[in-house]
C-alpha cells in the first residue's frame, strides 16, 4: 500500500556485527542482519531515494550484499566514506553512506523538495575557523535548546547532521540522471 507514496527510506541498520569494535560477524550477524528487513521495506515501498548509514567496516563486511540487494531491485547506488572532518568538524568520525535511487522515479519532485527545504539546505561546510559555533551569531544570550534541534535526535547520537546532508548531496549527484 505504500508503493509510490514514500520519497525516502533512510536508516542505519545495527553495526555491532560489522564494526571493528564489535563481534565482526558481518552483515549476516544477528544484529547487522537487520539489513534484510530494511531491504524488504525498500523493495515494498519503492521510494525515490534510499539513504543508508553504517560503520566504514561495511566496505569489507557486507557492502557487496547491500549493493547487490539494491541492484536486484533495479536501484542505482553510490557510496562513500566521508568523515565529519571532511565537512569542517574538529573530529574524524568516518561512516559509510549509501545513496540509492530508482531511475526516473521522483526526479522533479525530489529535486524541488531538496531545493525548497529551507535556508540551510545547501550549507554543508562549517565555519571557516574550523570550529562550529556553540552560540548564535545574533548577539543574544542563549536561553535554552536551539530552535529545531529536536529534529537532530532522529539522526541518532553518533551522527553529525552536516555530514549526513553533505553525504546525501555528494552521493546523489553521482547518480544518473543527475538530481542536483
Task: Annotate each predicted stretch with a short phrase.
Residues 168-179:
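Short, hydrophobic alpha-helical segments
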Residues 1-8, 15-161, 178-179:
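Class I S-adenosyl-L-methionine
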Amino acid at each position: 500500500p505504500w508503493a509510490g507514496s514514500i520519497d525516502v527510506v533512510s536508516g542505519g541498520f545495527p553495526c555491532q556485527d560489522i564494526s571493528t569494535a564489535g563481534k565482526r560477524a558481518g552483515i549476516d550477524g544477528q544484529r547487522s542482519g537487520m539489513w534484510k528487513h530494511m531491504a524488504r521495506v525498500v523493495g515494498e515501498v519503492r521510494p525515490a531515494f534510499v539513504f543508508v548509514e553504517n560503520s566504514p567496516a561495511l566496505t569489507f563486511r557486507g557492502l557487496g550484499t547491500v549493493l547487490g540487494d539494491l541492484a536486484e531491485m533495479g536501484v542505482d547506488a553510490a557510496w562513500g566514506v566521508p568523515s565529519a572532518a571532511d565537512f569542517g568538524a574538529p573530529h574524524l568520525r568516518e561512516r559509510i553512506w549509501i545513496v540509492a535511487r530508482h531511475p526516473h522515479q521522483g526526479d522533479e519532485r525530489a529535486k524541488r523538495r531538496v531545493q525548497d527545504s529551507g535556508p540551510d539546505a545547501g550549507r554543508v561546510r562549517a565555519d571557516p575557523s574550523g570550529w562550529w559555533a556553540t552560540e548564535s551569531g545574533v548577539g543574544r544570550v542563549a536561553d535554552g535548546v536551539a530552535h529545531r534541534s529536536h529534529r537532530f535526535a532522529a539522526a541518532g547520537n553518533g551522527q553529525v547532521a552536516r555530514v549526513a546532508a553533505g553525504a546525501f548531496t555528494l552521493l546523489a549527484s553521482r547518480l544518473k540522471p543527475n538530481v542536483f
